[in-house]
């Protein structure tokens, strides 16, 4: 499979998954405004897709949202196959992506250092 085709398929899977989660999943533990699909890693044969998800909120909210996604995984996969018009949708593996959380933490630490440096110069 060409890398270009694989990338296009990953982008399309991300778009469709976002739509399914936002519009079709009715589990109250999943709030789409707090959930973002950050990346899709698709296997060369399209049989597996690692779905990296960022969830804003505390640890309990993240765990509950991940449990809800795991529970709905079968439905999400069949809806994905229907919308992509493929016979076999990839097996989905949801993973929590903490990169946004780490970025926010780093930004706040840099801001603290900047404020301390400003205070010591005065």
Swiss-Prot record:
It comes from the Bacteria. Pfam families: RBFA (PF02033). One of its GO terms (biological process) is maturation of SSU-rRNA. Keywords: Cytoplasm, Ribosome biogenesis. GO terms for molecular function: ribosomal small subunit binding. The keyword Acetylation does not apply. It is found in: Cytoplasm. One of its GO terms (cellular component) is cytosol. Its main location: cytoplasm. SUPFAM superfamilies: Ribosome-binding factor A, RbfA. One of several proteins that assist in the late maturation steps of the functional core of the 30S ribosomal subunit. Associates with free 30S ribosomal subunits (but not with 30S subunits that are part of 70S ribosomes or polysomes). Required for efficient processing of 16S rRNA. May interact with the 5'-terminal helix region of 16S rRNA. Belongs to the RbfA family. Monomer. Binds 30S ribosomal subunits, but not 50S ribosomal subunits or 70S ribosomes. This is Ribosome-binding factor A. It comes from Syntrophomonas wolfei subsp. wolfei (strain DSM 2245B / Goettingen).
């Amino acid at each position: 499979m060409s890398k270009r085709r694989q990338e296009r398929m990953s982008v399309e899977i991300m778009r469709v998954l976002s739509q399914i989660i936002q519009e079709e999943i009715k589990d109250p533990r999943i709030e789409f405004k707090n959930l973002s699909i950050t990346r899709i890693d698709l296997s060369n044969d399209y049989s597996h897709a690692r779905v990296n998800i960022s969830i804003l909120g505390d640890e309990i909210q993240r765990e509950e949202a991940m449990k809800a996604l795991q529970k709905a995984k079968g439905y999400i996969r069949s809806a994905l196959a229907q919308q992509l018009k493929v016979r076999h949708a990839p097996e989905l593996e949801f993973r929590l992506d903490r990169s946004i959380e780490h970025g926010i933490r780093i930004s706040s630490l840099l801001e603290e250092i900047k404020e301390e440096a400003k205070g010591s110069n005065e």
